[in-house]
Amino acid sequence: MSYVIDRRLNGKNKSTVNRQRFLRRYRDHIKKAVEEAVSRRSITDMEHGEQISIPGRDIDEPVLHHGRGGKQTVVHPGNKEFTTGEHIARPQGGAGGKGPGKAGNSGEGMDEFSFQITQEEFLEFMFEDLELPNLVKRNLTGTDTFKTVRAGISNEGNPSRINIIRTLRSAHARRIALSGSSRAKLREATSELERIKREEPDNFGDIQALEVEIDRLKARIRRVPYLDTFDLKYNLLVKQPNPSSKAVMFCLMDVSGSMTQATKDIAKRFFILLYLFLKRNYDKIDVVFIRHHTSAREVDEEEFFYSRETGGTIVSSALKLMQEIMAARYPSSDWNIYAAQASDGDNWNDDSPICREILTKQIMPFVQYYTYVEITPREHQALWYEYERIGDDFADTFAQQQLVSAGDIYPVFRELFQRRLVS
């Protein structure tokens, strides 16, 4: 009897390796589809994957074939249309497609290949190459510290970490599985031999045959190794990062009367995308939500996105509150401070210089990165130009961009938060 032992480490997902290879091969198609989905779907609608379609012509495998020309002697069935030396016309056809049209009676094509990517894969492509810039470590001058923690049992490892009990248990189970039928037959043969010796002691032929069978079964059982490499089990130890830096992200949003509902919706989407990014990439990060009109308040996530409160426009109120929270809870000696501000650019005229002064003297010297997005199709106003002066003084830690429609959110988001090397 033959035994087939499946020793693949990912037995429950036997196509995982093939799927990962496929995703790497068609990365460009998938990234393009994900970017289109992000601009099309609501930012809050990120809890599922996406249907990806790849044109049939792009999944064709390269093949070797005979080129045109040369001489070949081939026997074909007779016909009434062609004579010696004539070229056979290529059949009509084309790639498959979607959309309205009339049915045809000739030609053939190939439909698009469609498949579903998971939410995890969708977010992985969406946030690829994104990282909070200039994340530096505080209170340590060296590299990150790690702590070693137990992480279960592994089939591979250092001999010094072998788990003897798990190894012997696995070996015992394997021996039972591989020699179980032989042991059962051995017990039957032994019982039969004892019966014959007791009842028919002169039946030497059967006694000899049973003794030969018993010797064969014992030899077969002995051939099952006591310990196999597959039985070896090791204590798995992994290095778990011991965070040596703490980060806080301030989210400032204008909810004044000058912000239309469409503008507020774009601002909300930008911050929801930012919030998803932070929660996915940074487990140890605080997020502070500040809404402002003529006055500013620190609110929770629910109120930040969905409250209907509105009013006039004094942007400096949010900056003052941010500075107070920084001083009270997030000293720059212990925290990496980041901020993102969204507004339509409208502000009380005398307040814009105050905003620049607060940012220049009380905020920018203490933050790692500050980004401002202005959501408007109109010409920029005083606040934008005051912020441009800040960008001249803090080119490495300040950035500003303009949003016009919801479709601009993702490209602007990538541009603001694309990965940068720490100098």
From Swiss-Prot:
This is UPF0229 protein PSPTO_0546. Belongs to the UPF0229 family. Residues 93-107 have a biased composition (Gly residues). It comes from Pseudomonas syringae pv. tomato (strain ATCC BAA-871 / DC3000). PANTHER family: UPF0229 PROTEIN YEAH. Residues 65-110 are annotated as: Disordered. It comes from the Bacteria. InterPro entries: UPF0229, vWFA_dom_sf. The lineage of its organism: Bacteria, Pseudomonadati, Pseudomonadota, Gammaproteobacteria, Pseudomonadales.
